[in-house]
Amino acid sequence: PASVIRFFRSEKNRGPAAARNLGIREARGEWIAFLDSDDEWLPGKLKAQLGFFRENPEYLICQTEEIWIRNGKRVNPMKKHQKSGGWIFDKCLPLCVVSPSAVMMHRKLFEEIGLFDESLPACEDYDLWLRIASRYPIGLIEKPYIIKYGGHADQRSREFPAMDQFRIRSLAKILSQNIL
């Protein structure tokens, strides 16, 4: 219902990590889900994820499959982007295989793992998923419940063409802080 939807606006654009962290801090529920501006949730997403958690109480995070649209056309993700469930830390190392818009997670994870790293201008999600996947299994609902739209001029990955530099920065931080 509209009565439970609240909006927050930052004084200034400090990037996706700061925006998500604001939402996490302001959230009142025990389950947190994200929706990026260029993605779309399909009907039933939240219900399916809450059902997953009821059936699998050992999980504190799960994601759904996704449909990719690039420049207005449906495309198939490459094999390296294939999603997996369970203990997926090793699959998370080479690239980001968890999508913020596909995830629902228990707020307890943020209390234990921390929030999105606001010092990273990109790959802040990769950084968080690595920290989570090193300690928790990530569930997978094999039905697509989100559409990811890409190929548009203001897509974040176009702003930072050398994304690997931020993944390396995240890995260096994780190693130096003995997170693993």
Which residues fall in each region the model found?
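Glycine-rich, basic loop-to-helix element that forms the pyrophosphate-binding segment
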Residues: 10-27, 48
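Conserved nucleotide-sugar donor-binding catalytic segment
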Residues: 17, 25, 81-170
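GHKL-family ATP-binding catalytic core of two-component histidine kinases
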Residues: 28, 42-43, 106
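Short aromatic/hydrophobic "clamp" motif used to bind/position activated sugar donors
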Residues: 32
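The conserved acidic donor/metal-binding loop of glycosyltransferases
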Residues: 36-40, 65
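Conserved donor NDP-sugar-binding/catalytic core segment of glycosyltransferases
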Residues: 44-76
